[in-house]
Design a protein with these regions (language model features):
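NAD(P)H-binding glycine-rich loop region in Rossmannoid oxidoreductase-like domains
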Residues: 1-17
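Hydrophobic, well-structured modules enriched for small/aliphatic residues and gly/pro motifs
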Residues: 3, 9, 47-49, 90
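Strand-loop microenvironment adjacent to phosphate/nucleotide-handling motifs in alpha/beta enzyme folds
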Residues: 32, 62, 66-218
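SDR active-site strand-loop-helix element
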Residues: 38-43, 81-83
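Catalytic tyrosine of NAD(P)H-dependent dehydrogenase/reductases that use a Tyr as the general acid/base
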Residues: 53
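Active-site helix of classical SDR
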Residues: 56
Length: 218
């Protein structure tokens, strides 16, 4: 996916082609080749998106979810896992701060800014759980902490000064893993949530709910 938020704001056509057209091509290819199960990786920015990247990932998520009804007799199952910031991944804030630490000055967009953080291992575990649990149409969301960017910066370079540079195009102060509109068909489990789609009444399907507790009933 095209995943850098400001880059997507300045290059919308490439972002749409990669994240939306690419998802459509992948759904078609998996169905054509008879793939049994597909788990797509998504992002917290797809929840109530305000930037182009988040909007394209929201569309991508919906394409994969709808692929379950589109697959027909092939019975290809599609599900989605929603990540926060994967610590250490390419383009994320921690590797950037590490590269800047020797300069003794870290650029901070806004002192109030927070981000959800998860480890690579947590991300991999969530994917494997999705493969084991999925019926088709689920969005799996890991329970992960939200951290202040200033706390992350201090953990990496305690002595470094912070230079306030302002929020970049398309960025939010605070992300959310699950939007208010999704809460009515979101179920809670020990270490994750599962958002079930409203289409085809799948949010009421006992096989998909699988002993989950409804987050919001009204």
């Amino acid at each position: 996916a095209t995943k850098i938020v400001p880059t997507a704001e300045y290059n919308p056509f490439e972002c749409v082609k990669t994240n939306i057209s690419g998802a459509m091509n992948l759904v078609d290819a998996c169905i054509d080749q008879g793939v049994k199960s597909v788990v797509a990786l998504s992002t917290d920015k797809a929840s109530s998106p305000v930037n182009l990247y988040g909007a394209t990932k929201l569309v991508s998520d919906k394409l994969f979810i709808a692929g379950n009804s589109y697959s027909g007799a092939q019975d290809t199952q599609f599900a989605v896992v929603r990540y926060g910031n994967v610590m250490g991944s390419r383009g994320s804030v921690i590797p950037f701060f590490v590269t800047q630490a020797d300069k003794n000055v870290l650029p901070i967009t806004d002192t109030r800014m927070t981000r959800f953080m998860m480890t690579v291992e947590e991300g991999v575990d969530l994917v494997w759980h999705a493969f084991e649990d999925m019926v088709g149409g689920e969005i799996y969301v890991k329970k992960i902490p939200s951290m202040k960017i200033t706390d992350v910066a201090r953990a990496i370079a305690p002595a470094a000064k912070h230079e306030i540079v302002g929020i970049l195009p398309g960025e939010k102060l605070h992300e959310q893993m699950i939007g208010l509109e999704d809460a009515a068909h979101t179920y809670e489990y020990e270490d994750h949530y599962k958002i079930l789609p409203a289409i085809f009444n799948w949010s009421q399907d006992p096989a998909r709910i699988n002993k989950g507790k409804l987050v919001q009933s009204d």
